[in-house]
């Protein structure tokens, strides 16, 4: 009798920088999976800061944050060190293959559109994100949109796909 596998081909395809399979990790503990844009983006930096602030609540609920990024592991390490979460699990995806997987299906938008988007300008200036988190040049794919997924038992339970780069996800509702 042949054994039936409940594993998806995606299971083996996504590994963290430490070599752990993402969906296997979500079978051990729930995962808050945060897809970042580029490290020069104010809102990317804000997402890292937001998750850092939520770290005690995530730990209380036994939820492990994992970040997916387009940058080099060295640049990522510097950012996560700066925000106080140097040992957080990370996935290096310079070609954005994981971002485009049907299970995540994150959009793309020309970076120039952000400059004429009132919600983005509101986030930068009125909310003060540009002053709090800074901004620098786009060093990876600036078209890539971010997103956040809550994984449990090898499945996506809830998701938040950004419509614009300044969208503010409700992390606590997402991990509900």
Q: Which residues fall in each region the model found?
A:
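N-terminal "domain-start" segment that seeds a small globular fold
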Residues: 1-24, 46
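A generic fold-level signal
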Residues: 17, 27-28, 60, 143
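A generic local structural motif
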Residues: 17-21, 51-54, 78, 135-136
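Short active-site neighborhood of thiol/selenol oxidoreductases, capturing the structured segment around
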Residues: 22-51, 64
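Short beta-strand/turn micro-motifs composed of small residues
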Residues: 36, 69, 152
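Structural microenvironment flanking redox-active thiols in thiol-disulfide oxidoreductases
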Residues: 47-100
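Thiol/selenol-based redox catalytic cores and closely related redox-interacting motifs
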Residues: 89-166
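A short, polar/charged loop-to-alpha-helix boundary motif
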Residues: 166-176
